Amino acid sequence: MLQQVMTNPGEITFREVPVPEVKDDQVLVKIRNIGICGSDIHVYHGKHPFTKYPVTQGHEVSGEIAEIGKNVSGFQIGQKVTIEPQVYCGHCYPCRHGKYNLCEELKVMGFQTTGTASEYFAVDASKVTPIPEDMSYEEGAMIEPLAVAVHGVKQMGDVKGMNITVIGAGPIGNLVAQTAKGMGAAKVMITDVSDLRLEKAQECGIDVCVNTLHKDFGEAMVEAFGPDKADVIYDCAGNNITMGQAIKYARKGSVIVLVAVFAGMAEVDLAVANDHELDIKSTMMYRHDDYVDGIRLVNEGKVHLKPLISKTFAFKDYLKAYQYIDDNRETTMKVIINVQED
């Protein structure tokens, strides 16, 4: 079978390797689609601090069951699935308490261990989640980033009836906003400096879409929600400007959730955060229930994934996909690799 390998930053080759043998507790997945995310792009540019080369990428993935290990039940040949890419120890304090996303030895497929970018991939059945038969493989490859959004939204607890602001309308911010609405938020405002991203958010049903190049962030919140502003602000951009906005304009005693991976060392006014008794939370990846909830939200028509797909590339055009992203950064949301297309 064919397997992708990033040998060095900006260099991708393909090699012929045997189809992996399936162990008793594993399934063999015929890989269909793979999404490219911001962390993959960091690897492509040699800027991911926890990835060494060569590496086979692929952690946002969909496929179908091709073979089932003898100890595995609950799956059928040909069944559509996605894969949870975390590899965890199961023994550390977080793992023992069900928070394996915080494992002390956490590895992620496509970064610290072999990813799914191959025609077939053998994986523990415990990491495989079925997706509905009427869900496309492209959408299936986006369940992973949706799970990130679901887990992030849940850091606030029950958001039903709340007023919510999301900073950053890229794929994760868009999905956070959609998830919050899908979970019952009363009103959701999203901000960005890209009209295209805001148009996508509007297409996905977000209530208020604001370009903060043209409108003051604080004024926009008051216009959207009144003087009480938002109950929670989700920072899905992750830089000093956006976190500064969140801290400055958050209602006193409210919550800020940092969803984005912060860009470098933070320089923010913690004196204001302290004086306003702001509750600043963070979020890390997801757990199985976030996958299940994300799939349910899509199935119920509360989250829309297709509008976020900008372009699809054949497997052998993996490098061209990265080049396309670099050349069209301002107009690209999500690029998908079709592994079964030559």
Identify the residue ranges that each predicted region occupies.
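N-terminal glycine-rich cofactor-binding segment
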Residues: 3-21, 38-67, 82-83, 100-114
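NAD(P)H dinucleotide-binding glycine-rich loop of Rossmann-like/cofactor-binding domains
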Residues: 89-167
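C-terminal hydrophobic helical "lid"/dimerization subdomain
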Residues: 3, 244-248, 288-342
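Glycine-rich cofactor phosphate-binding loops and adjacent beta1-alpha1 units
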Residues: 156-160, 199-279, 319
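Conserved beta-strand positions in the Rossmann-like core of class I SAM-dependent methyltransferases
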Residues: 66, 188-189, 257
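Glycine-rich beta-strand-centered segment in the early N-terminal region that forms part
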Residues: 20-34, 47-93, 127, 132-134
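Mid-domain Rossmann-like dinucleotide-binding core that forms the NAD(H)/NADP(H) cofactor-binding site
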Residues: 135-214
